[in-house]
Amino acid sequence: LLIMSKSYIIDSVRSPIAMKNSDMLGFRSDDLSACIIKGLLDRNSNMNKDDIEDLVTGCAFPEGPQGMLMARSISILADLPLSTGGKVVNRFCGSSMDSVHQVSQAIVAGDIKAGIASGVEDMFTVPMGGFVPDFNERLNEKEFYIGMGETAENLAKELDISREDQEDFSILSHKKALDAIDNNKFDNEIIP
């Protein structure tokens, strides 16, 4: 008989979204992530950091300053116990979501009692494709390397979404985000 635990998301926070030449430029991903985790723990004082057994970090380009098992570095910089594990998940755009899944699965399976799922990407430090891209040309025969733009075009055609509909959606999305910023709707989720 196997009794499964339940997992819960008790809080979520993030960094501000940065633009090129913004104030965020120059911050290391691991330092910023550690700052966010410290902020998360500070606002959840009922959470004992000694109970956190794993940190799973999603990262599409875990190389350069985002390499060397960055989750472990973040864990140490965030003053989590040395016993807290760390691993990096790379599923490109789905990396952070997969980190949430993996922490939840570990809790449900009884492997850990508490964990932190996170994600990080510094698009200004690591060039698109990585530092030394070495794509297997044979995969081009199978249409494996399709960029996001081409994927979007294929989906728009398949789902009959016009360019005008896409632009209207984008404008509405930006208006909603600006309205949320103006009305302080994001204040509780952004650290620092």
Predicted region positions:
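Conserved "HGTGT" condensation-loop signature of ketosynthase/thiolase-family condensing enzymes
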Residues: 2-84, 118-192
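Alpha-helical membrane segments and immediately flanking helix-loop junctions
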Residues: 92
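Hydrophobic alpha-helical hairpins/lids featuring a short glycine-rich hinge
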Residues: 99-130
